[in-house]
């Protein structure tokens, strides 16, 4: 029987056909062409990642990336390019059980197979301290660069990386400078006191001058300083040609990615003029190995870029393609519609149907087997009573006046994690009850238990708020949880406690008393005019679950995503507290009708 293919699908195919072949590199005799292949912030995401796409009026879900596909595509691009550099802009570690269990070994092995020419340090490379970074670098064969992270002579990390390097392609010398973000590494990670950090602009200026003094006129900055800082560097320092960015997890691209419903921040590449009036091109390739950046540039004889074109490449696993229904569930596609959608996707320049490297599949399979075995190992023991969690215990009631003590426990582990880092300061953490998916029973807790309790891979986001805003954030959550929203919004905290009534007063308010905990353990009332640094998970930071005020603050004033995973924080907490006595208090006093 002939299947009906919706007109919108046919229309999407026509648009895709019009886009194919629309990007061309302009070069002349005597020019030098270079292809820069890059990723950043893969955060131990070694397997394909789920991605939602909007195609021809349909919401689709498919898996993209994964190291087996990335390695295949890197090797293909290398083989097809006249001259290529393959670069990683930092934050290889922290984010999945692969990092927790293998402490960088799995990441290093796969990065070696990928054949990166250079890797720069990110802030999360220091999350397990100097020794943790040294262990990762022991397995890593990729040359490491960082011009502004300088271990002293007595440091265990001394001599393990260089500030910069010069490579040759087709007889042309290319300088590559490494750079890390200073503030986040110092304040939100765990570098040793034997590490000196140099201001980003100062370090780049110095390294650029040194390159130029050696006669190098093609310079690439491989920088984990974040997109905004990298644009600032481009505007203030002459001599740099390309900046391969990391840290900010930005997806750059054109309108074709926007039509797919992806969170495009700006164009790829971003063109900025240096103080010398020469172009600098800044690129970044989102996160978690979901895409692979490809930038093709042409240098003239003086080392100035005359042409720069490229895009992020999404390596889509076609056998995972599904349609999302109105109920948010995933459903298989009918064959005719599936084929039409695949044609539309094939005509989108940024979409490549993934092929995988067989050797990487085998290597990763061994790590997966080991991960499954290690996942059943205990990370700590909880003694005392059960800490209630899950959907039944989200809101305190007469039978369970404390509500979700498990959610308070999750918040405490997040607060403990961020307070353990450097000079960073956070006053309190708020966690929504829907994020803690089960009870926490006394006994051994395994790695798998941690990811069962916290399956959403939310990260810890730091937000600066006033006391009045902190109170309103809790009010918003209570209204959503107790009104016409979801009980999953009900707020619990660490370093913060409150008393609230079930029904609002005549002013629509429920909070009766709100306190924060000082470093000496004393509880004091929240000062509505005072500033507080609040930790929240990345889900409610986007204003989800009725956290309207919080979402508005983040979208207008910004926030700092630490990219510390909630499950990782819990694991770290239990490792440090091998026999932890369960909380019996949820930090909430709830007045029923």
From Swiss-Prot:
Residues annotated as binding substrate: 456, 539-545
UniProt-annotated location(s): Cell membrane
Binding residue positions for a divalent metal cation 2: 91, 123, 224
Catalytic reaction list: a ribonucleoside 5'-phosphate + H2O = a ribonucleoside + phosphate
Record-annotated site: Transition state stabilizer: 124, 127
Keywords assigned by UniProt, alphabetized: Cell membrane, Hydrolase, Lipoprotein, Membrane, Metal-binding, Nucleotide-binding, Palmitate, Signal
GO cellular component, one term: plasma membrane
Chief location bin: membrane
Similarity comment: Belongs to the 5'-nucleotidase family.
InterPro entries reported in the protein's UniProt record: 5'-Nucleotdase_C, 5'-Nucleotdase_C_sf, 5'-Nucleotdase_CS, 5_nucleotidase/apyrase, Calcineurin-like_PHP_ApaH, Metallo-depent_PP-like, NadN
Lineage of source species: Bacteria, Pseudomonadati, Spirochaetota, Spirochaetia, Spirochaetales
Binding site for a divalent metal cation 1: 41, 43, 91
Organism: Treponema pallidum (strain Nichols)
Cofactor: a divalent metal cation
Residues with a covalently attached lipid (N-palmitoyl cysteine): 22
Name of the protein in its database record: Probable 5'-nucleotidase
EC nos: 3.1.3.5
Pfam (any one): Metallophos
